[in-house]
């Protein structure tokens, strides 16, 4: 088994706060494989507006309307995406397999268990998403792209 592997150093996307942590994991991953991010950002530039009556008060509702599915964008640029539900017992082996195949794993975690998140570690549960781009079995560590706080832009 390989002891160390880094698929490539990810460049964080911190120009703006974009949607949520999933996209802040996805955008650097997409940039790693394509060299650019515009297709993802421009895909969501379409907006839908509607007026709804909420408690008898007309309210303007704005929604993003993606012009293409993300699957179509990935396929267009030759990126293969595989969604997996993995038990925590198999998560490490599965992630290492993805990295050994030159992929990047984007996983959901609970910040309560992540020491890097000083604001939430052992304090409260918060769902989060991180990209994993490398590992070092000699130190039992993964290389991840992460911010310092729950609402920080990485």
Q: What does each model-found stretch correspond to?
A:
Residues 33-56, 88-141:
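Active-site-adjacent substructure of cysteine-protease-like catalytic cores
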Residues 2-88:
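Cysteine-nucleophile protease catalytic domains, especially the papain-like/related folds used
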Residues 73-86, 121-126, 144-150:
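Hydrophobic transmembrane alpha-helix bundles
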């Amino acid at each position: 088994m390989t002891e160390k592997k880094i698929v490539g150093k990810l460049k964080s996307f911190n120009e703006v706060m974009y949607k949520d942590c999933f996209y802040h994991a996805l955008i650097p991953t997409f940039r790693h494989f394509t060299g650019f991010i515009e297709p993802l950002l421009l895909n969501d530039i379409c907006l839908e507006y509607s007026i709804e009556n909420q408690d008898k008060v007309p309210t303007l509702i704005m929604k993003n309307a993606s012009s293409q599915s993300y699957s179509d964008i990935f396929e267009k640029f030759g990126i293969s995406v595989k969604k997996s539900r993995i038990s925590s017992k198999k998560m490490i082996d599965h992630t290492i397999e993805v990295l050994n195949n030159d992929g990047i794993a984007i996983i959901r975690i609970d910040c309560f268990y992540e020491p890097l998140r000083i604001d939430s570690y052992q304090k409260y549960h918060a769902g989060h998403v991180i990209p994993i781009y490398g590992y070092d079995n000699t130190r039992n560590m993964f290389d991840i792209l992460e911010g310092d706080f729950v609402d920080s832009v990485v």
